């Protein structure tokens, strides 16, 4: 759906700007501003989360509650890569990013790479899907058993 008043180029630029703002506000922990980028009925998905953990957050309240807890779980030392890619659909963007940090519960390194797809409707994010390597998370926890038995709200996309 093309946003009223914008041509395809304007919509694509708006989508790419939303993707940039999404990442920068989240990494800066400016959650009150970050959540305003979302549609009321937005969906945040983590398809690679373990089957025992929650993979979908629906609506601004759930999404904000989940993401605002991240700083208490992961210390991000650096964002080592960030690229936003336009797609054929002007209301979709792909985002690649990588972080270096550590899992606070164990002190172990958490150096993760992500690919995410952001979809926009009426100028707001209505769907975000983030893919990451679960093996990095398992290693940060100290192994599979520790990962599976850890607090189910430990890392992005690993909630129950």
Identify what each model region corresponds to:
Residues 90-99:
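A short hydrophobic beta-strand element
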Residues 22, 34-35, 42, 59, ...:
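Hydrophobic pocket/interface hotspot
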Residues 37-91:
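A solvent-exposed, acidic/Ser-Thr-rich amphipathic alpha-helical stretch
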Residues 113-139:
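Short beta-strand edge/turn micro-motifs at domain boundaries
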């Amino acid at each position: 759906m093309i946003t009223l008043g914008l041509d395809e180029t304007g919509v694509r630029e708006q989508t790419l700007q939303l993707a940039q703002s999404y990442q920068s506000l989240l990494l800066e922990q400016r959650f009150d501003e970050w959540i305003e980028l979302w549609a009321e009925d937005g969906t945040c998905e983590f398809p690679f989360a373990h089957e025992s953990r929650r993979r979908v957050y629906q609506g601004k309240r759930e999404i904000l509650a989940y993401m605002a807890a991240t700083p208490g779980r992961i210390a991000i030392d650096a964002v080592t890569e960030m690229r936003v890619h336009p797609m054929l659909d002007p209301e979709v963007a792909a985002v690649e990013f990588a972080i270096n940090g550590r899992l606070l519960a164990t002190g172990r390194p958490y150096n993760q790479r992500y690919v995410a797809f952001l979809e926009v409707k009426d100028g707001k994010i209505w769907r975000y899907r983030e893919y990451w390597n679960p093996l990095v998370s398992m290693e940060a926890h100290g192994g599979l058993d520790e990962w599976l038995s850890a607090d189910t709200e430990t890392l992005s996309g690993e909630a129950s």
